[in-house]
């Protein structure tokens, strides 16, 4: 290793000065002479010149043993910078960050004294800065969210009534029965899409693992019964799950083709394609001893006759159906095509809707059936009331044409006389709740192939309608005698001489 100390003591080492070196001057004149253009343009071309501060920054120059030392003047602004505290530096940092385009709310240092404690958003799990937080309105809840996350992911916009998803059922928005310990899901068992797959924690009442976490479904289940067949063993093994949950783009919702009921012309009253018959036998005859409501003992009601002007009851009596229909809606069923559901609760014997369509004769009905057969149509909406009086709702009608058949129906069809006109109404056979399908017994005679019944009732007959019964012919032959199988012995008397 090179020894610099020995080199300095060696006599062979000669120190030479720069040819442009000038004699040392005293005071500020030295700085002027060194920084003069003549000296800077010397033979050294400034390569060997030291870094000399400007003249206005030189405070004092000391020369000792040919070595010149400069003392720099102290700037008053430097004294202020040396007196900076941490808050001043933080403010300066915030100012520079805001100038660069960063939001001032994000310029937040949680380690400072008195700073708010930062929490993570329960949706995106990123820090929530002051001014961007949306806190839960439930007392004692520490949940915090970004305003944007709560609006886009949870659908909340009002900060005053905001609640965490775990405080209410995601379906009925009422107080929850259980909360999931792994996600913000909360619900009741009856509102859960897979209630059997919810794992309720025994040691934590009100806590559970919801259906979103299939890997934990079998934590609390009992072992299955031992099987000897390899096929049964593989059937009981849980399937591997790669995706636990996925989201569907809302744009796909518009691309789904909405299925509508079969097209038909909606009408409010029957359209007669035959001569309209009017029964005038009951004109001028009505109830006389009924009260204002006309209960079941009403003479007109027993005969399925609507009260009219000839009755002594007022216009507001209860035996005037076909005036106000119940609220119903057309829905798509799982096994029976289109059907009708009750949109409100219906009491027993209440009028629901009138069965209307085109009134045709028997000849027209037969012709239409042949035409439908040639066209391949399988759905018929014909209701035969009496001779030459068939209501066909195939092309024109109302929602009653979609009522399905059931072997255990909750509705009945009744034929009434209203102001001398024959009309058919659908009445409730029992109490019907809202959302319950409306059905009645078709009672039709099947002449062609059998049609399977999908009503699902306990007393389902299996097939729609009944076949036409052929009479059993009893063949009687009066000429032939029946052969006896047993002979009774006859006692003979002895002959007398």
From Swiss-Prot:
Gene3D superfamilies the UniProt entry points to: SET domain (2.170.270.10), Zinc/RING finger domain, C3HC4 (zinc finger) (3.30.40.10)
Domain SET: 326-443
Record-annotated AWS domain positions: 283-326
Source domain of life: Eukaryota
Alphabetized Pfam families for the sequence: SET
Tissue-by-tissue expression: Expressed in roots, flowers and buds, the anther and in stamen filaments.
Stored SUPFAM superfamilies: SET domain
Compartments, as annotated in UniProt: Nucleus; Chromosome
Catalyzed reactions: L-lysyl-[histone] + S-adenosyl-L-methionine = N(6)-methyl-L-lysyl-[histone] + S-adenosyl-L-homocysteine + H(+)
Family (UniProt): Belongs to the class V-like SAM-binding methyltransferase superfamily. Histone-lysine methyltransferase family. SET2 subfamily.
Name assigned to this protein: Histone-lysine N-methyltransferase ASHR3
Organism listed in the record: Arabidopsis thaliana (Mouse-ear cress)
């Amino acid at each position: 290793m090179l020894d610099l100390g020995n080199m300095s003591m060696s006599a062979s080492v000669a120190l030479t000065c720069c040819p442009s070196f000038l004699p040392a001057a005293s005071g500020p004149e030295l700085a002027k002479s060194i920084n003069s253009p003549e000296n800077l343009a010397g033979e050294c071309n400034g390569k060997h010149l030291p870094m000399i501060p400007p003249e206005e920054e030189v405070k004092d120059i000391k020369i000792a043993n040919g070595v010149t030392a400069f003392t720099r003047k102290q700037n008053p602004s430097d004294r202020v910078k040396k007196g900076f505290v941490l808050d001043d530096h933080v403010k300066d940092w915030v100012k520079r960050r805001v100038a660069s385009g960063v939001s001032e709310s994000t310029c937040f240092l949680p380690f400072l004294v008195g700073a708010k404690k930062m929490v993570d958003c329960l949706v995106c799990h990123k820090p929530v800065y002051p001014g961007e937080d949306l806190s839960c309105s439930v007392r004692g809840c520490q949940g915090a969210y970004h305003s944007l996350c709560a609006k886009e992911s949870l659908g909340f916009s009002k900060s005053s009534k905001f609640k965490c998803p775990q405080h209410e059922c995601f379906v009925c928005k009422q107080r929850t029965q259980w909360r999931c310990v792994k996600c913000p899901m909360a619900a009741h068992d009856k509102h859960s899409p897979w209630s059997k797959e919810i794992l309720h924690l025994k040691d934590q009442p009100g806590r559970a693992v919801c259906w979103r976490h299939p890997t934990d479904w079998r934590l609390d289940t009992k072992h299955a019964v031992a099987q000897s067949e390899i096929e049964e063993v593989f059937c009981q093994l849980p399937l591997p799950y790669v995706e636990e949950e996925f989201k569907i783009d809302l744009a796909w919702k518009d691309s789904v083709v909405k299925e509508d009921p079969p097209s038909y012309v909606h009408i409010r009253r029957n359209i007669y394609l035959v001569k309209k018959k009017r029964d005038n036998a009951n004109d001028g005859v009505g109830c006389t001893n009924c009260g204002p409501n006309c209960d079941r003992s009403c003479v007109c009601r027993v005969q399925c006759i609507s009260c009219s002007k000839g009755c002594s009851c007022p216009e507001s009596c209860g035996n005037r159906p076909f005036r106000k229909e119940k609220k119903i809606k057309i829905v798509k069923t799982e096994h029976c095509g289109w059907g009708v559901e009750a949109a409100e609760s219906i009491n027993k014997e209440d009028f629901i809707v009138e069965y209307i369509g085109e009134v045709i004769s028997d000849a027209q009905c037969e012709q239409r059936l042949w035409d439908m057969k040639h066209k391949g149509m399988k759905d018929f909406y014909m209701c035969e009331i009496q001779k030459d009086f068939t209501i066909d709702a195939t092309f024109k009608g109302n929602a009653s044409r979609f009522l399905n058949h059931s072997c255990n129906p909750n509705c009945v069809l009744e034929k009434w006389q209203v102001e001398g006109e024959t009309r058919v109404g659908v009445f409730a056979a029992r109490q019907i709740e809202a959302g319950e399908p409306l059905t009645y017994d078709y009672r039709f005679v099947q002449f062609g192939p059998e049609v399977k019944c999908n009503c699902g009732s306990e007393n389902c007959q299996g097939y729609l309608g009944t076949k036409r019964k052929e009479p059993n012919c009893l063949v009687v032959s009066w000429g032939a005698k029946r052969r006896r199988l047993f002979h009774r012995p006859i006692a003979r008397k002895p002959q007398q001489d």
